[in-house]
Amino acid sequence: MDRVEALKQKAFEVKGFDGFLVTSEVNLYYFTGCPGLTSMLIPKTGKGIIYAYNVNYEQAKYMTKGFELEMLERGQNLMAAVAKQAKACKIKKLAFDTLNFESYRQLAKELRGQARLKPKGDLVGELRRVKDPKELQLMRKAAELTNTGMKIAYETIKPGMKEYQVAAEIEYAMRKRGSWGVAFDTIIASGARSAFPHGGGGTQLGGGCTNREIRNGELVVVDMGAVYEHYRSDITRTIVAGKPQTKQTELYEIVRASHDEALKAIRPGAKAKDVDSTARKVIADAGYGEYFVHGLGHGVGLEVHEGPTLSSLSKDNLTIGNVVTDEPGIYLLGFGGVRIEDTVLVHKGNAECLTSGPYNLEANC
């Protein structure tokens, strides 16, 4: 409930709204501690009203406290139910975190002009990006499991292994030790595929690892993370199956230096774009600036990509309690890529790497 009160303070007292509609499943979990909910309407006065379809109603009743609960039947119009309650609460300025076009259109129609709608998901994002002690405890556990997975990667990668076999060993090791799942589709990108930052895969289609056989002397980018009580971690290492070539070692040392310089720059009050610039300068000075093709990092928490963002376009400033990634890389088409990534906690005066897997370039084969 403290989180709901914090949102009320931001949305109602500071911004002047008198209602807030939460529809993102992740945001709903953040505020209620219950997965599988549909929506929650928070009026300026009184309790928040949670909407759950009948399939999840008993779960919601069991897992939530301090809220009113309304069950929706299959096929019932959610936006009509929300609008009815908003009118009953005399809400005139209704903020929301996210709505697709059709839901927005339906809600506006049902409200009949009695309340103005405005997207304000950034207010929830501002709360979520500062982790409290309980969240940090869970993220430390997720990072611990992730570190275990990366150690397995170093022990598993060898010539003749298939990419999906390496992923399976990593994921099994993390699951066996308590991971609730994987933070995202594990990326095992070997050979020329390592020059693609996501291993040639897609967010929804997957494909971060394939049936390709790892060959002796190839670069292998391993990007993976564990989940613990819905909180995630993220780590990347670049590993050679065999003895590294001179060029591979050169690229690795440049990326490692970029990673380490960025880590020094991650501190409370730092501009996120300046941290990105610090990492980017190291790579540019070495002659590979055009091959660092993405931002330095992103926030991690209930989602593997959330605020704040570390890039040249970011307007974010870092603050105590932020958890972000530090992941510079160099990607040479036809040769391969190198990336090193850690999940980092912003502390008072410094930064702490939550992930701490090996930093060796050579596999333990």
Locate the predicted segments by residue.
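Active-site neighborhoods and metal-handling regions in enzymes and metal-associated proteins
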Residues: 1-365
